[in-house]
């Protein structure tokens, strides 16, 4: 089983790196876990809608270049479906049961994900209507993936 998170931008904060490294270590018992960073598109603070669309399209191309045809792709999107930890674990377990051994999660940059990435996604997932920094989302997602595996394996981590 291979789990990959594709994130836009470079993770600079040591505390996020440390947290993700801890969950990556824990996940090593259950899967090959990988985080792939794609460069964010440099843009001024104030953008027109056309400029925003162009930034998202360029970042989207970089994301799509990192996704293989066989991968089951979750796009993290505000309009995605919210799931409980138990529902998420059940879904991951079902995917692996039905032969999806490569699961990829995509976290967009500050403007979100391009329509092309959303179209490629097999499912959209939301962690609520909060706006969170995409760097923090990598840590939260890593923890939820670990939690899903502990639920699947009946371990006491999830209470």
From Swiss-Prot:
It is an enzyme of class 2 (transferase). Its EC number is 2.1.1.177. CDD domains: RlmH-like (cd18081). It comes from the Bacteria. Gene3D superfamilies: 3.40.1280.10. S-adenosyl-L-methionine binds at residues 76, 108. SUPFAM superfamilies: alpha/beta knot (SSF75217). It holds the Pfam family SPOUT_MTase. The keyword ATP-binding does not apply. Keywords: Cytoplasm, Methyltransferase, rRNA processing, S-adenosyl-L-methionine, Transferase. It catalyses: pseudouridine(1915) in 23S rRNA + S-adenosyl-L-methionine = N(3)-methylpseudouridine(1915) in 23S rRNA + S-adenosyl-L-homocysteine + H(+). One of its GO terms (cellular component) is cytoplasm. Homodimer. PANTHER family: METHYLTRANSFERASE, RIBOSOMAL RNA LARGE SUBUNIT METHYLTRANSFERASE H. Specifically methylates the pseudouridine at position 1915 (m3Psi1915) in 23S rRNA. This is Ribosomal RNA large subunit methyltransferase H. It comes from Limosilactobacillus reuteri (strain DSM 20016) (Lactobacillus reuteri).
């Amino acid at each position: 089983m291979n789990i990959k998170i594709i994130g836009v931008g470079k993770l600079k904060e040591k505390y996020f790196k440390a947290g993700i490294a801890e969950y990556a270590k824990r996940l090593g018992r259950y899967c090959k876990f990988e985080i792939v960073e794609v460069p964010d598109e440099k843009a001024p603070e104030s953008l027109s809608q056309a400029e925003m669309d162009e930034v998202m399209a360029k970042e989207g191309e970089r994301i799509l270049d990192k996704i293989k045809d066989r991968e089951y792709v979750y796009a993290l999107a505000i309009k995605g479906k919210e799931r409980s930890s138990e529902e998420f674990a059940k879904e991951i377990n079902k995917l692996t049961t039905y032969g999806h051994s490569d699961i990829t999660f995509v976290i967009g940059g500050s403007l979100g994900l391009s329509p092309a990435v959303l179209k490629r996604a097999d499912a959209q997932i939301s962690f609520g209507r909060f706006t969170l920094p995409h760097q923090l989302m990598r840590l939260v997602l890593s923890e939820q993936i670990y939690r899903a595996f502990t639920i699947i394996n009946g371990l006491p981590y999830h209470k």
